[in-house]
């Protein structure tokens, strides 16, 4: 058997019908790809040189990685893991255990960790302490009610959508560029210091009042629809390309300073006037479900898709 291959360094056995994998004692093994099999049990004890593990799309129920202290990358998405403990693994940089059945995940004190994806599990809590270098976190589609990112100063990518979060405070995460926090229970979203945003989706939440995105000069995509927001501040956001603010409580919407915008969905609000005459790149406009009395367009402006309840409201500047 493979246990006698004591000098084995690389093992690629992906896309087979393997049901169990015993690599115990292979202390020179550095690379394993056993993805797309039927593996239920995997023994990696004594694999002290292992650096990269790809075990995606199997049926693995438990994975003990504690003896693999040199691991740098672990991919084990789409398995049947219920728990995963990689705490204190100081060389681990990348971890993807998404699409499992995890109820516990211990990733604390992985001092070199850059990327974690633990989305689509059953996590009710997530300890992010000791991950000061983390740049990307995917914890979407879990059972999280709180998320403390205060000790992640380098984080630029966060996907925490489809949880039960009521508050998200990103005050200390000033490098955030991509934020997807839709489909939660958010009433509070603190992003005042997040001036590097390029994409934000905070739709399907309980947000009220004003969403102030002013001075986000690199912001290109916004989705704040299906909320209770009443005001949107886009001052100096000149690079916005798509804006979705449908089904909110906006009675006014100023997009005159967004010349790069190609798509606007503001349907189902309480807008009475809308001026898109400065949005000469606009290709798609959904503004139905508003009591519009005036929609301002520019002379000769060409919008390929325009949906409006009252075409008589259209006028030209």
Predicted segment positions?
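Leucine-rich repeat
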Residues: 5-8, 26-29, 47-50, 68-71, ...
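Conserved hydrophobic beta-strand positions in leucine-rich repeat
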Residues: 11-13, 30-34, 51-55, 72-76, ...
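Canonical leucine-rich repeat
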Residues: 21-23, 42, 63, 84, ...
């Amino acid at each position: 058997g493979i246990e006698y291959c004591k000098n084995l360094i690389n093992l690629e056995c992906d896309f087979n019908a393997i049901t169990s994998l015993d690599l115990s004692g292979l202390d020179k093994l550095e690379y394993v790809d056993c993805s797309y099999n039927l593996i239920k049990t995997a023994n990696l004890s004594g694999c002290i040189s292992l650096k990269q593990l790809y075990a995606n799309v199997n049926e693995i129920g438990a994975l003990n990685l504690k003896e693999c202290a040199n691991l740098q990358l672990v991919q084990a998405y789409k398995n049947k893991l219920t728990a995963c403990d990689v705490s204190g693994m100081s060389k681990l940089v990348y971890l993807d255990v998404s699409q499992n059945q995890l109820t516990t995940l211990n990733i604390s004190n992985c001092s070199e960790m850059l990327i974690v994806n633990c989305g689509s599990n059953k996590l009710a809590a997530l300890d992010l302490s000791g991950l000061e270098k983390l740049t990307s976190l995917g914890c979407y589609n879990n059972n999280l009610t709180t998320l403390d990112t205060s000790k992640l100063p380098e984080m630029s990518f966060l996907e925490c959508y489809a949880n039960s979060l009521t508050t998200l405070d990103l005050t200390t995460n000033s490098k955030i560029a991509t934020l997807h926090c839709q489909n939660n229970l958010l009433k509070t979203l603190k992003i005042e210091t997040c001036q590097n945003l390029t994409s934000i989706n905070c739709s399907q939440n309980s947000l009220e009042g004003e969403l102030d995105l002013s001075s986000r000069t690199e912001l290109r995509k916004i989705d704040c629809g299906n909320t209770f927001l009443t005001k949107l501040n886009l001052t100096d956001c000149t690079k916005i390309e798509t804006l979705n603010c449908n089904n909110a409580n906006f009675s006014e919407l100023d997009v005159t300073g967004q010349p790069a915008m190609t798509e606007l969905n503001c349907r189902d609000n309480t807008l009475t006037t809308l001026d898109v005459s400065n949005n000469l790149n606009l290709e798609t406009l959904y503004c139905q479900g508003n009591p519009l009395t005036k929609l301002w367009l520019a002379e000769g402006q060409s919008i390929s898709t325009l949906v409006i309840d009252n075409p008589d409201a259209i006028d030209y500047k």
